[in-house]
C-alpha cells in the first residue's frame, strides 16, 4: 500500500479508534497515531487492515477546530489530499482544508461513508437488517397490533373489548364482565396496546391488598409488563431518590388502603402525571349521595387528574342502580351528575334492548316496538331499514345487524360500559360436585372441646374461623409434636383418590400454606406421589417452576398443593380435578378456588371433590354453599349479597356446628333468596349491551386473524437469525421449547430482556399457556422488539459487499442494492406508525440507473450471492469508488418519486380515517351524551398534528450492498 506521512486512514477492525494519521514508516511497517484516543498501532505495510479515508465532492467534512466544509473539489499533492469548498459557518468560498487537519473523532454513520471507509459488515447482517425493516413495517400496520403478544387464549369477547377500548384516546370505561370471563386480561390487553402504541407511558393500578401479587404476576407473565409494587417500605425508600416517590417508576401497583391512608401520599399519587389509572374491585368503593366513603373520594381525586381510567367491577345488576351510577360518575362526572335522571334514562333503554333481542332472535316486531326503534334513531330516515329487518326478505338479516349497530352507537352507556355474561359467552365446562362425608377423629373432638373452654371470650367470628380448620386447633395444643395427618381421615381419602387416579392431574387447595407443605411431605413419604407446592411464601420464579412441573405431561407432578393466597391469579385449565381439602370462609373465595380450573378454554367438565368432617363447621358450610347457594355447580352472582344478609346466623352455626336447630330453615330461606335474586338479575340483563360487549361476528374474525398470524412461521426463522447475530446461544429442548442463554461474544454485554441465567421460550401459544416458565415469543415480545431496536438503531448490516457468480453478465459488472427508509418524526402518542411506519424501499441499480428490484426478488437474489472478506472488500471499494458514487446519485434522484407516493398515501389514509372517526362521533354526540367533548377535541387535535407530521416526512439511505459479478 502506498503510505505517506500525514495521510488519514481508518482501522477496519477497530473503527472506534476514529481517524488515524500516518506518523512513521519503514520498508516493512507503518505506524498510525489515533489522536481521539491517543493510541498508536503498528501494521505490516504489505497487508494492513486499514482503509484510506478519502472524501468526494458533495460531502461535508469537519475540521479539528469544529467548523464544517462542503467539498467542491479534491486536490492531491505528493500523496496527500486537500479539500476545497465552502465553509458552512462563515459561508466563505474556496476554503482549503488539508486532510491532516480533519477531525479525528470522525464517526461514519451513513452507509456509503461506512462502505468507503472500509467498515464492511457481514452479508447475513445486511439481510437481517432489511428483513427487520420489512417485518417491523408490516407489524406496525397490522390492525390488531398490541393484541397478539399476550399469553392468553384467543377469546373473542376479550379481544373485542380490548380492540375497541385500546385504540381510544385516554379511554374511560367500566369493565363489568361476570366472574371467570377475564376482566383482568381485558384490562391487561388494553394497557398493552396503549403502552405499545405510545398512547400511554405511565400507568397506576390500584387493587385490594390481597390481589397485588396476582396483578403483578398476571401483568408480567401474560403481557411482559414489569410493574413496581409500592408499599410503605418501597415508598419510604423512593423518597430518597425523588421528591415524588411515584415518579421513580413508570408502571406502579399499590393497594387501595395504601393509597388512601396517608394524605401526603395521595397528593403524591395525584401529582405523578399518570396516563392511565386501573382500579380493580371498584364495586367495593362505597358511595351515597350524602356520604361517599374515603376510598371512593380517593379514587375520585385520582380520576379527576388521570386522563384514562379503567374500572373493573361486578356486574351492574349485582351492584344495584345507585352503586352502578357511582362508578359511572367516576368516569364522567359531567355526564353522570344526577342519579334520578340516570334512573329515568335507563328505563327508556330497556324496551329498546328487548326489541333488539327479539329482532336478533328473528321474531317479528309489533308496531309499538317498531315505533320505539324509530324514535330512538330519530335523525335518520330508517323506515326502509325497519321494514327490511321485519320482513322475510333475503336482506332481512343484514338489515337487523345494521339496526343493532346503529342502536349500539346510541345506546345509553355502551361506550363506557362493557359487560359479558356466561349466558352470552359460550365455552364453559360443567361443574360436578362430589362430597365425601368423613368421621370426626376423637383427637379433634378433644381439641375442639378444650378450645371451646379456653376461647370462651373469643368473638363468634373467630370461633367460627377456628372451627373450619380443626387440624390447626389440634396443632396449637400439641405444638411441633402434633402429627394430625396420621389420623385425619381426609388425608387417607386423598391418598386413596390420588393412587386410584394416577394418570390424572389434580389441584388440591387448602386455606393455609403450612397445611399444603405438610400434605406434600405425607404424600411423598407414604405413597411416593409427585406433588408440587404453591404458597405465598414462595417467590414468583419458584411458583413458576412448581406450576411448570405440574404442567409437564409425563414426568411432571400429579398433584399441585396450593394455599388460598398462593393460588391467586393462577389458572390451570389443563387439569379438571379439584380437591378442596377444607372450605373458605365466604362465597367469593369459593368461586375463586373453582375459577382456577373453570375458565374459558377448559376442555373437560370439572370434578369438584370436597372431603369434609361431620359435626364440624365444614359440614355446615358444605350444605350452605351447595343447598343454599348452588355455589359449587354454578357461578353464584348472588353469593355476596346472601352471605351478608345471612352472616349473623351462619356465624353461629359455624361456631357451634352440633347445634342444628333452624339450620334447614336458614338454607331454605337462602335458597329462596338466591332464586329470587337470580331471576331479578336475569330480568335486568341488558341484551343490547351484551351484544355490543361480546362483539359477535366481528370478534370471531379478529380471533381468527390473530390465530392465522400465530401459524405464520416467518417469525421463527427471523428470531433464530436475530439471536444468532446478536450472539445469543440457543438450545432446542424439544416439545417446542428453546433455552436462550447469553454468550461471551454478544453485540451488547447485557441484552435487555434476557436474564443472566437465560430463559426458556416457545413460539406456540398452547405450550406457553401450559408452561408458565416459558416465555411466549411473538413480534410484540420485548426480546424481539429490543432485538429489532438494537439492529435498526445502530449501523449493524448497513454496508456490505457480495459477489454474484453469473456467467450471463460480464465480469466486473457492478450492481448497488439500496435500502431507503421513508419515515416521519413525531411524538410517540400521535401513533404515526399506523399510517407511515419506517418503511423500507428497495432499489437494485446498475451503473446506468436501471432499477431491477421489481424483477429480482430479495430472498432469491440473496441466496445467489457469496460473501467477501473485509480486506478484499476494501480493495474492491477503492477500485470502484467513483462508479458507486455515480450510482448513488442516480438512486437519490429515483427514490423521491417512490417516497412521495408512500407519504401521499399515508396522508390520505390518515385524513380519511381520522376525519371519518371525528365526523361519526360528532354526529352521534347529538344522540349519545356519553361521547366526551375532550375525546372529540383530542381526535381533532391528533388529526391536525398527524397530518402536519406527515407533511414533514422524509427519506434516507439506511443500508447498501455493493455487488460485483464474477465467473469464479
UniProtKB/Swiss-Prot annotation:
Broad enzyme group: hydrolase
Entries under SUPFAM superfamilies matching the protein: P-loop containing nucleoside triphosphate hydrolases
Source organism superkingdom: Bacteria
One Gene Ontology molecular-function label: hydrolase activity, acting on acid anhydrides
Motif DEAH box, residue numbers: 280-283
GO terms of biological process kind: regulation of DNA-templated transcription
Entry-linked CDD domains: DEXDc_RapA (cd18011), SF2_C_SNF (cd18793)
Domain Helicase ATP-binding stretches: 164-334
Name of a matching Pfam family: RapA_C
InterPro entries: Helicase_ATP-bd (IPR014001), Helicase_C-like (IPR001650), Helicase_RapA (IPR023949), P-loop_NTPase (IPR027417), RapA_C (IPR022737), SNF2-like_sf (IPR038718), SNF2/RAD54-like_C (IPR049730), SNF2_N (IPR000330)
EC identifiers of the protein: 3.6.4.-
Keywords: Activator, ATP-binding, DNA-binding, Helicase, Hydrolase, Nucleotide-binding, Transcription, Transcription regulation
Protein family according to the UniProt entry: Belongs to the SNF2/RAD54 helicase family. RapA subfamily.
Oligomer and partners: Interacts with the RNAP. Has a higher affinity for the core RNAP than for the holoenzyme. Its ATPase activity is stimulated by binding to RNAP.
HAMAP family for the chain: Helicase_RapA
Protein name in the entry: RNA polymerase-associated protein RapA
Amino acid at each position: 500500500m502506498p503510505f505517506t506521512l500525514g495521510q488519514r486512514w481508518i482501522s477496519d477492525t477497530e473503527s472506534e479508534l476514529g481517524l488515524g494519521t500516518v506518523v512513521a514508516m519503514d520498508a516493512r511497517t507503518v505506524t498510525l497515531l489515533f489522536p481521539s484516543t491517543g493510541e498508536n498501532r503498528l501494521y505490516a505495510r504489505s497487508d494492513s487492515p486499514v482503509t484510506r479515508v478519502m472524501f468526494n465532492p458533495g460531502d461535508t467534512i469537519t475540521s479539528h477546530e469544529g467548523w464544517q466544509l462542503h467539498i467542491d473539489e479534491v486536490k492531491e499533492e505528493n500523496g496527500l489530499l486537500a479539500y476545497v469548498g465552502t465553509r458552512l459557518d462563515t459561508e466563505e468560498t474556496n476554503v482549503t482544508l488539508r486532510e491532516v487537519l480533519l477531525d479525528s473523532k470522525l464517526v461514519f454513520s451513513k452507509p456509503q461513508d461506512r462502505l468507503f471507509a472500509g467498515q464492511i459488515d457481514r452479508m447475513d447482517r445486511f439481510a437481517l437488517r432489511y428483513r427487520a425493516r420489512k417485518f417491523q413495517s408490516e407489524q406496525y400496520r397490522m390492525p390488531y397490533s398490541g393484541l397478539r403478544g399476550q399469553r392468553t387464549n384467543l377469546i373473542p369477547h376479550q379481544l373485542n373489548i380490548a380492540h375497541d377500548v385500546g385504540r381510544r384516546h385516554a379511554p374511560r370505561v367500566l369493565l363489568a364482565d361476570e366472574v371467570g370471563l377475564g376482566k383482568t386480561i381485558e384490562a391487561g390487553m388494553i394497557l398493552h396496546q396503549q403502552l405499545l402504541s405510545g398512547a400511554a407511558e405511565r400507568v397506576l393500578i390500584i387493587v385490594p391488598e390481597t390481589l397485588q401479587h396476582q396483578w403483578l404476576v398476571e401483568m408480567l407473565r401474560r403481557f411482559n409488563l414489569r410493574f413496581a409494587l409500592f408499599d410503605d417500605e418501597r415508598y419510604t425508600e423512593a423518597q430518597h431518590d425523588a421528591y415524588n416517590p411515584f415518579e421513580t417508576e413508570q408502571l406502579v401497583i399499590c393497594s387501595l388502603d395504601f393509597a388512601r391512608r396517608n394524605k401526603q401520599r395521595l397528593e403524591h399519587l395525584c401529582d405523578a402525571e399518570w396516563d392511565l389509572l386501573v382500579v380493580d374491585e371498584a364495586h367495593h368503593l362505597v358511595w351515597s349521595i350524602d356520604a361517599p366513603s374515603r376510598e371512593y373520594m380517593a379514587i375520585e381525586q385520582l380520576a379527576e387528574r388521570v386522563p384514562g381510567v379503567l374500572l373493573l367491577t361486578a356486574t351492574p345488576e349485582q351492584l344495584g342502580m345507585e352503586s352502578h351510577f357511582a362508578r359511572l360518575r367516576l368516569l364522567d362526572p359531567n355526564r353522570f351528575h344526577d342519579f334520578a335522571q340516570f334512573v329515568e334514562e335507563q328505563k327508556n333503554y330497556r324496551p329498546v334492548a328487548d326489541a333488539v333481542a327479539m329482532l336478533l332472535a328473528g321474531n317479528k316486531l309489533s308496531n309499538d316496538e317498531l315505533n320505539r326503534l324509530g324514535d330512538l334513531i330519530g335523525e335518520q330516515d330508517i323506515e326502509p331499514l325497519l321494514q327490511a329487518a321485519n320482513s322475510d326478505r333475503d336482506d332481512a338479516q343484514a338489515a337487523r345487524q345494521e339496526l343493532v349497530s346503529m342502536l349500539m352507537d346510541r345506546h345509553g352507556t355502551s361506550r363506557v360500559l362493557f359487560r359479558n355474561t356466561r349466558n352470552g359467552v359460550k365455552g364453559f365446562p360443567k361443574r360436578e360436585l362430589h362430597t365425601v362425608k368423613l368421621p370426626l377423629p376423637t383427637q379433634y373432638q378433644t381439641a375442639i372441646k378444650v378450645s371451646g373452654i379456653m376461647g370462651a371470650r373469643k368473638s363468634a367470628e373467630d370461633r367460627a374461623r377456628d372451627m373450619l380448620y380443626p387440624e390447626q386447633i389440634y396443632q396449637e395444643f400439641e405444638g411441633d409434636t402434633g402429627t394430625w395427618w396420621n389420623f385425619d381421615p381426609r388425608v387417607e381419602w386423598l391418598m386413596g383418590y390420588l393412587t386410584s387416579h394416577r394418570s390424572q392431574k389434580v389441584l388440591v387447595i387448602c386455606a393455609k400454606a403450612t397445611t399444603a407443605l405438610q400434605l406434600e411431605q405425607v404424600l411423598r413419604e407414604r405413597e411416593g406421589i409427585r406433588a408440587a407446592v404453591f404458597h405465598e411464601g414462595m417467590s414468583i420464579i419458584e411458583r413458576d417452576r412448581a406450576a411448570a412441573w405440574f404442567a409437564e405431561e409425563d414426568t411432571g407432578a400429579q398433584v399441585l398443593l396450593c394455599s388460598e393466597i398462593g393460588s391467586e391469579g393462577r389458572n390451570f385449565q389443563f387439569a379438571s380435578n379439584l380437591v378442596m381439602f377444607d372450605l373458605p370462609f365466604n362465597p367469593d373465595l369459593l368461586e375463586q378456588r373453582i375459577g382456577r380450573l373453570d375458565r374459558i378454554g377448559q376442555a373437560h367438565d370439572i370434578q369438584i371433590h370436597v372431603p369434609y368432617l361431620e359435626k364440624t363447621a365444614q359440614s355446615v358450610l358444605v350444605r350452605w354453599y351447595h343447598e343454599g347457594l348452588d355455589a359449587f355447580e354454578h357461578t353464584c352472582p348472588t353469593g355476596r349479597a346472601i352471605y351478608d344478609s345471612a352472616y349473623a346466623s351462619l356465624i353461629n352455626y359455624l361456631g357451634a356446628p352440633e347445634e342444628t336447630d333452624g339450620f334447614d330453615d336458614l338454607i331454605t330461606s337462602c335458597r329462596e333468596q338466591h332464586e329470587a335474586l337470580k331471576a331479578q338479575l336475569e330480568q335486568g340483563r341488558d341484551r343490547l349491551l351484551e351484544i355490543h360487549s361480546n362483539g359477535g361476528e366481528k370478534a370471531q374474525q379478529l380471533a381468527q386473524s390473530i390465530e392465522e398470524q400465530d401459524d405464520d412461521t416467518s417469525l421463527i426463522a427471523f428470531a433464530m437469525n436475530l439471536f444468532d447475530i446478536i450472539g445469543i446461544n440457543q438450545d432446542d429442548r424439544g416439545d417446542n421449547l428453546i433455552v436462550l442463554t447469553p454468550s461471551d461474544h454478544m453485540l451488547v454485554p447485557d441484552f435487555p430482556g434476557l436474564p443472566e441465567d437465560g430463559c426458556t421460550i416457545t413460539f406456540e401459544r398452547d405450550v406457553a399457556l401450559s408452561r408458565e416458565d416459558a416465555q411466549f415469543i411473538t413480534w410484540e415480545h420485548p426480546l424481539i422488539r429490543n432485538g429489532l431496536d438494537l439492529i435498526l438503531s445502530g449501523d449493524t448490516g448497513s454496508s456490505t459487499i457480495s459477489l454474484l457468480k453469473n456467467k450471463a453478465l460480464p465480469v466486473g459488472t457492478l450492481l448497488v442494492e439500496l435500502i431507503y427508509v421513508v419515515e416521519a418524526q413525531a411524538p410517540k402518542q400521535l401513533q404515526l406508525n399506523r399510517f407511515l411506519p419506517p418503511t423500507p424501499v428497495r432499489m437494485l441499480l446498475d451503473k446506468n440507473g436501471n432499477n431491477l428490484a421489481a424483477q429480482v426478488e430479495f430472498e432469491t437474489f440473496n441466496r445467489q450471492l457469496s460473501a467477501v472478506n473485509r480486506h478484499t472488500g476494501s480493495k474492491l471499494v477503492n477500485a470502484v469508488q467513483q462508479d458507486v458514487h455515480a450510482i448513488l446519485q442516480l438512486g437519490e434522484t429515483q427514490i423521491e418519486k417512490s417516497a412521495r407516493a408512500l407519504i401521499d398515501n399515508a396522508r390520505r389514509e390518515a385524513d380519511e380515517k381520522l376525519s371519518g372517526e371525528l365526523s361519526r362521533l360528532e354526529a352521534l354526540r347529538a344522540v349519545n351524551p356519553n361521547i366526551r367533548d375532550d375525546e372529540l377535541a383530542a381526535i381533532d387535535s391528533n388529526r391536525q398534528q398527524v397530518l402536519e407530521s406527515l407533511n414533514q416526512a422524509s427519506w434516507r439511505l439506511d443500508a447498501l450492498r455493493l455487488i460485483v459479478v464474477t465467473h469464479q
